[in-house]
From Swiss-Prot:
Name of the protein described by the UniProt record: DNA polymerase IV
Locations listed in the record: Cytoplasm
Naturally occurring in which organism (per UniProt): Streptococcus pneumoniae serotype 4 (strain ATCC BAA-334 / TIGR4)
HAMAP family xref list: DNApol_IV (MF_01113)
Keyword line: Cytoplasm, DNA damage, DNA repair, DNA replication, DNA-binding, DNA-directed DNA polymerase, Magnesium, Metal-binding, Mutator protein, Nucleotidyltransferase, Transferase
Any single biological process term in GO: DNA-templated DNA replication
Molecular function in Gene Ontology: damaged DNA binding; DNA-directed DNA polymerase activity; magnesium ion binding
Residues that coordinate or bind Mg(2+): D18, D116
Catalytic-site annotation from UniProt: E117
Enzyme category, top tier: transferase
One GO cellular component term noted in the UniProt record for this chain: cytosol
Assigned EC number: 2.7.7.7
Subunit structure: Monomer.
Function: Poorly processive, error-prone DNA polymerase involved in untargeted mutagenesis. Copies undamaged DNA at stalled replication forks, which arise in vivo from mismatched or misaligned primer ends. These misaligned primers can be extended by PolIV. Exhibits no 3'-5' exonuclease (proofreading) activity. May be involved in translesional synthesis, in conjunction with the beta clamp from PolIII.
Amino acid sequence: MLIFPLLNDLSRKIIHIDMDAFFAAVEIRDNPKLRGKPVIIGSDPRQTGGRGVVSTCSYEARAFGVHSAMSSKEAYERCPQAVFISGNYEKYKSVGLQIRAIFKRYTDLIEPMSIDEAYLDVTENKLGIKSAVKIARLIQKDIWQELHLTASAGVSYNKFLAKMASDYQKPHGLTVILPEQAEDFLKQMDISKFHGVGKKTVERLHQMGVFTGADLLEVPEVTLIDRFGRLGYDLYRKARGIHNSPVKSNRIRKSIGKEKTYGKILLAEEDIKKELTLLSEKVALNLHQQEKAGKIVILKIRYEDFSTLTKRKSLAQKTQDASQISQIALQLYEELSKKERGVRLLGITMTGF
């Protein structure tokens, strides 16, 4: 039995563009000697005492299991021959603006998700081109010819499916999901690949025996809403290719944060501080990717007895600097009166954009 009606707008033409290994690709483009080598954008752990996180990496590095947001130390252990580059975010921002300018030739309905990916609604576009697939190919061609970079594209009738499509064939892929193909495409997909379904939700779905889109299709809406609340409503519709959220050209993020729940309680102050530093670096990475800087740092800490505290500090000037965010987060931690208790969750959020 359906709790809410299924409304599915099949008339829209949505493209999701995702640049391939963007920061690393820009560095390789500007230094051809790096071509074919495992390139990691992030601090070299040999120079930072093991600190730092991976912003992104080339596909050669990914072959060794390196990925975004991994600690630089672990990345080096997996791929000691990698070339580490600290990154030039002003350069990446400049290239990102050039990419945005290419998008605007076709439509003003652009929703940037970060510096290197965006949704485009081309249902009504500036050039009067009826085929969204043709527009996606033209955008890929423009980006390659003008910037010597590759992008993957997904085309469908909503944002969820367009994102799933762009992830399907990387790098430099183009995947189209038509309305009549959506359900079969999603049926064979591992549930962990569903966009917007986080690791904890995946674990809970696995406990319910849900491992694929086909499994998710079999779960009644009432069960999903009972288990997951509002997310259950969305899961039921995503399994059926339904997602009617519009492309928002004025989308504003009010905060950017990272938190982590620890399977093993953190007891040592040294371990807690190390985790806070790592979380700060991940938040800084997200700030760079979103082209944001904030004035307020918020620390969240949940103890082993599940009691939760938050502390915040306002800065004189906006920042996206990892070391400054880390310094403030550690200062907030030092001000806590219950440092002797075990910690099960840490979180750092930046706001005040």
